[in-house]
Amino acid sequence: MAPHWAVWLLAARLWGLGIGAEVWWNLVPRKTVSSGELATVVRRFSQTGIQDFLTLTLTEPTGLLYVGAREALFAFSMEALELQGAISWEAPVEKKTECIQKGKNNQTECFNFIRFLQPYNASHLYVCGTYAFQPKCTYVNMLTFTLEHGEFEDGKGKCPYDPAKGHAGLLVDGELYSATLNNFLGTEPIILRNMGPHHSMKTEYLAFWLNEPHFVGSAYVPESVGSFTGDDDKVYFFFRERAVESDCYAEQVVARVARVCKGDMGGARTLQRKWTTFLKARLACSAPNWQLYFNQLQAMHTLQDTSWHNTTFFGVFQAQWGDMYLSAICEYQLEEIQRVFEGPYKEYHEEAQKWDRYTDPVPSPRPGSCINNWHRRHGYTSSLELPDNILNFVKKHPLMEEQVGPRWSRPLLVKKGTNFTHLVADRVTGLDGATYTVLFIGTGDGWLLKAVSLGPWVHLIEELQLFDQEPMRSLVLSQSKKLLFAGSRSQLVQLPVADCMKYRSCADCVLARDPYCAWSVNTSRCVAVGGHSGSLLIQHVMTSDTSGICNLRGSKKVRPTPKNITVVAGTDLVLPCHLSSNLAHARWTFGGRDLPAEQPGSFLYDARLQALVVMAAQPRHAGAYHCFSEEQGARLAAEGYLVAVVAGPSVTLEARAPLENLGLVWLAVVALGAVCLVLLLLVLSLRRRLREELEKGAKATERTLVYPLELPKEPTSPPFRPCPEPDEKLWDPVGYYYSDGSLKIVPGHARCQPGGGPPSPPPGIPGQPLPSPTRLHLGGGRNSNANGYVRLQLGGEDRGGLGHPLPELADELRRKLQQRQPLPDSNPEESSV
């Protein structure tokens, strides 16, 4: 999330310059359509175990869509998205094992990802996959939709090893032009031409030719058609790379456009089987006055026209401004790219160790140019006949001095907090006869933005949620069917370019400014322009103020049925108003009169909730409330309420539409009741157990110091002798008597019998442990506590404890024990039972 200071600082700069930044900066889509609302419009395909719908190819004549995914190929009918065929093309287990042994990931990398899929001729497709980091290519029979038998071709230079790396390619007259990374490590970039009648051609492996590029797109432009100079067709490649010419930022990444000529044959001695027409220039997507620069090129779309002169390119860019992430769309004209490639070159100066403009005379024929009529008149019919000095110049000067600037000298659209990933464009003729360009932009969180280009600015028609938090991985448009196809990691989606039926009123249809839609006066519906007569349709794409347009045509106004609401006096009443557009504002009426935006102590409009709050409703607040969605001078009825106020206790209510899923509410109530019952039973059980424990404790207390020990009568034991331990420690008598004269005896500290054998059972002495094979545990007996202490009453008349007087023995015990000291680890408990 960008800090507030960054957003406000940038907004202040835009406002201060006052150059109309509101027409391209962070525009708000007029409508937001969730995936649930698209359920009746879109078609979806997914299959267990199939992932990464990366490559989409349309064949308009056959009406088929070919899809390349991870280790699978599919053929669909475009209109119904019905599966026509499927091919499983998995990398063998041994290839995957080798991939894992080389340190690659067995979950995301060691598979066969389809990266190239295009028609080779009328009967076959040419397909290439990463094949677990050992790229392979083969042919697909379009009639049977099966892989051709035989050995797979080596895909090196045609397809990347790594599925995450950029790739661009296209087939032109049976020849494959590809831009990829040519080795396992991804350190050797290459722009390659192979297959077809000519021998293969590739770029020089030099940093100032290609420096860590990430390829995003390619385009074929037939510039020889209708050329007065006899020019050649060209193939353009779009990528981003680390700039070698930057003085201050050695690690700066810039966007590039490069081009080669279709008829390039390489040089005879210099640049043998290397491009002699390879030139590149920087693509600028910036607004210098706003200090916005976009260099991270993500995707490029080529919009062809009936004439190649009108070819337009749309680039998708990303940038970071402070902690704020931005995305932008820039438009480029082919003639601007041609102008830059005909301009001055850059040159590296060894002395200054930097790149600068080449100022010396340019040799003739012009280095890097295609073979044209001028070359033929001067005896150069092929690049093989070009002089070495021309080829050496091209080899050292592939970079142009000037950069290709965007149309309108700034981006068409900039959005903050959004990552644009893909773009396709379409040209549409409106009812006014003008041609409009409609852009469809995919995002990193699964949304599709639809915008119409209106000269130097755009209007965001809507945003559609195609996927749930999944990046859009591919996007194509069928010009003939007017259908869009988008792929993500888990599914494929088909949807029409426009859903005109969702506009329910004339004003809503016209305010959408969608070139595909118009309001039909005869049917009172918003319909697609293509299938209706223009004389009965209303459409205004360029007009921003549509007030009165629908009224003049006599269109019917649709008013929603009011909801009856009864509230208690003193209640804060919330009346929601669902606006038809994100660009609209709510206007409320009460009793037919307009309500102010805020009336302290009575009415308050909450923009966050999009609701009118009636504070402490009183009988004077009863009546009819109507909410209108007001946009560009047009008023659309949105909600209506009939409120009645009755006397009673004060509670807070919110007006809501009738619950559609009442069964779910009752189910939740029953579940909550069951949980409460279980908790109640648990509390009662714990309470019963606690009562039992307390009763046991009370009974034990009543038995304290009441019953003497009944010990068996045995013969008198011999007199006690101390144990023959030299380190015996005497006990301190202090702490072994109670305040009432009672003696504490610790079991286990008795005197030892002479001889080494087990002692004979002693006679019954009050307080002495009972005889046992080892030692008697007194913890559970009466007159003893948990530590086994026995309390002896040595004073008074009952000192004998067994009914016969033992004064001599008692005195002897008291005298002996007073001479002993407590053991170091002893800590006898003072309590007794």
UniProtKB/Swiss-Prot annotation:
Keywords: Cell membrane, Cytoplasmic vesicle, Developmental protein, Differentiation, Disulfide bond, Glycoprotein, Immunoglobulin domain, Membrane, Neurogenesis, Phosphoprotein, Postsynaptic cell membrane, Signal, Synapse, Transmembrane, Transmembrane helix
Disulphides: C99-C110, C128-C137, C261-C370, C285-C330, C500-C517, C509-C526
Intervals, Cytoplasmic compartment: 685-833
Keyword Repeat attributed: no
GO molecular-function terms, A-Z: chemorepellent activity; neuropilin binding; semaphorin receptor binding
Region Disordered: start-end pairs: 748-807, 814-833
Listed name of the protein: Semaphorin-4C
Similarity comment: family membership: Belongs to the semaphorin family.
Sequence positions bearing Phosphoserine: S742
Ranges of residues in domain PSI: 499-551
Signal peptide: 1-20
Domain annotation Sema: ranges: 30-497
Species of provenance: Homo sapiens
Region annotated Dominant negative effect on myogenic differentiation, chain positions: 46-489
Cited function: Cell surface receptor for PLXNB2 that plays an important role in cell-cell signaling. PLXNB2 binding promotes downstream activation of RHOA and phosphorylation of ERBB2 at 'Tyr-1248'. Required for normal brain development, axon guidance and cell migration. Probable signaling receptor which may play a role in myogenic differentiation through activation of the stress-activated MAPK cascade.
SUBUNIT field: Interacts (via the PDZ-binding motif) with GIPC (via the PDZ domain). Interacts with NCDN. Interacts (via the PDZ-binding motif) with DLG4. Interacts with PLXNB2.
Sites carrying sugar chains: N106, N121, N310, N419, N522, N564
Any single biological process term in GO: axon guidance
InterPro entries: Ig-like_dom, Ig-like_dom_sf, Ig-like_fold, Ig_sub, Plexin_repeat, PSI, Semap_dom, Semap_dom_sf
One GO term describing the cellular component: postsynaptic density membrane
Topological domain ranges for the Extracellular compartment: 21-663
Positions of transmembrane segments: 664-684
Topology term for the membrane: Single-pass type I membrane protein
Sequence motif: PDZ-binding, positions: 830-833
Ig-like C2-type domain span: 556-644
Pfam family, one: Sema
